[in-house]
Amino acid sequence: MSHRHHFRVGPVGFRVASDWAGPIADLKRLYADYPTLEGCAATATARIEAARPWRRWVRPAVHIGGDYTIPDALPLPLSQGLLAAEMAMNLQVALGWRQHLLLHASAVERDGRAIIMVGASGSGKSTLAAMLGEGDWRLLGDEFAMLGLDDEQLSPFPRLISLKNESIAAMVACVPPERLGPIITGTPKGIIRHLVPRADAIARMDERATPALLLFPTFGGEAGLRPVPPSEAFMRLTDSSTNYVALGEPGFAALTRLVRDVPAVAIGYASSDQGVAAVEALWAELEA
């Protein structure tokens, strides 16, 4: 493949290759401020490629590959090439990373302490993280929270934030256009647009944080909150982890310490602004 880009996000060094120039051009623009891999080996290789040579030009169909693949995954149209590249990068980390316990979660930090937000697609965790990250919080990650196996510290993984549908307009109004990727339509999740994290999140990607609150958000439901007991938090987090089973005892120990030491709360909210206000109120109580 003649089109490539190498860069680092937190502890992961990515080598991304493509049969097409367009997706790599998008990656180079959006990841322009991330460190390169000069003199360092990549820890994850992602590829987006044509199923057959002629599919580079005739009805291009983008297949996701790399160190790890899903053989029966359906191809994407070339118009969704950036999304395919991001999905390929996610796949390599989800299936291959063993240095941390991975939680499918977003996370933000303030004063060295972090909130981990866990929820299914549509729960609003990405939008909450994006909005908090534009305020007094530092974004640690949108896709994965990386928990240390020995020290309970979160390693930042500030990839592009995947904005979806209504959340796009909310963020477009408050960030400069150069931090936004192309509008991607026709995806299974609707309209997607990627947002580059603020400069401080990228510059401080090697500064870890201590988990201080586990949050389980639900967007669109009845407003309110309830404490989540450690047993329930443990089960929810095992469901959200992509490598808990593969890690074995170290993963179990890390997750047990997390739910033992960190309070957990479930919140419902009807709007993003209401969600942000609820998070800030919870944080104020935690610090009181």
What positions do the PLM features span?
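A short, compositionally biased
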Residues: 1-3, 57-58, 102-104
